[in-house]
Amino acid sequence: MSVMQNNSEKSKWFLPGILGGLATTMKHLLKNLFNQKKMMTLNYPEEKYEYSPRFKGNHVLTVKKDGSLRCTACMLCATNCPAECIKITAAEHNDPTVEKFPISYEIDILRCVFCGFCEEACPVDAIRLGPEWQTPGVNGANFIYDINHLAYRPNLKGGILTHVDDEERHKAGI
């Protein structure tokens, strides 16, 4: 036995709801169509958004003026990383004044949350989060950055140089 329910109360609000949603959509469509100067959308990639200087993008390993890595393989960045995306393999250096250095330094960008903990933990300013953020690629191997990708780029797209002068750091109190 089936029971018929009276849905007349609900059905009388159906058409006004549809018309109200349609009116809102048409209002925004016409506003954006005829007033494109105030539109918030950028035509990417022709127009690029200007990010703040404090923006944290892709990682950069800094090098000294002699071309050697600033990293001392202390593992503080890898220890502080909440995503565990930094892998460092350390080795002893030939120079007795240098304790160790990284022979392998990899960052898995797909796991990274760009929190900046690695940058804050580094005692020698060896890792920075630079201005680049676009990382195109088709497979996961393209997103594991090694020492060559992280450090040996003469000039990044934001004007940040990868080499750091020790004298300037000491003057600044870093």
From Swiss-Prot:
Keywords tagged on the record: 4Fe-4S, Cell inner membrane, Cell membrane, Iron, Iron-sulfur, Membrane, Metal-binding, NAD, Quinone, Repeat, Translocase, Ubiquinone
Reported cofactor(s): [4Fe-4S] cluster
Domain 4Fe-4S ferredoxin-type: 61-91, 103-132
Single GO term (MF): iron ion binding
Binding sites annotated in the UniProt record for [4Fe-4S] cluster 1: 71, 74, 77, 122
UniProt subcellular location: Cell inner membrane
Principal subcellular localization: membrane
Catalytic activity: a quinone + NADH + 5 H(+)(in) = a quinol + NAD(+) + 4 H(+)(out)
UniProt topology in membrane: Peripheral membrane protein
Protein EC: 7.1.1.-
Cited SUPFAM superfamilies: 4Fe-4S ferredoxins
Record's GO cellular component terms: plasma membrane
4Fe-4S as UniProt keyword: yes
Source superkingdom: Bacteria
Comment on bound cofactor: Binds 2 [4Fe-4S] clusters per subunit.
Gene3D superfamilies, A to Z: 3.30.70.3270
Keyword Transmembrane: no
Record: residues binding [4Fe-4S] cluster 2: 81, 112, 115, 118
Family in the record: Belongs to the complex I 23 kDa subunit family.
Job of this protein: NDH-1 shuttles electrons from NADH, via FMN and iron-sulfur (Fe-S) centers, to quinones in the respiratory chain. The immediate electron acceptor for the enzyme in this species is believed to be ubiquinone. Couples the redox reaction to proton translocation (for every two electrons transferred, four hydrogen ions are translocated across the cytoplasmic membrane), and thus conserves the redox energy in a proton gradient.
NCBIfam families from the UniProt entry: NuoI
Oligomeric and partner information: NDH-1 is composed of 14 different subunits. Subunits NuoA, H, J, K, L, M, N constitute the membrane sector of the complex.
Name used for this protein in its record: NADH-quinone oxidoreductase subunit I
Gene label: nuoI
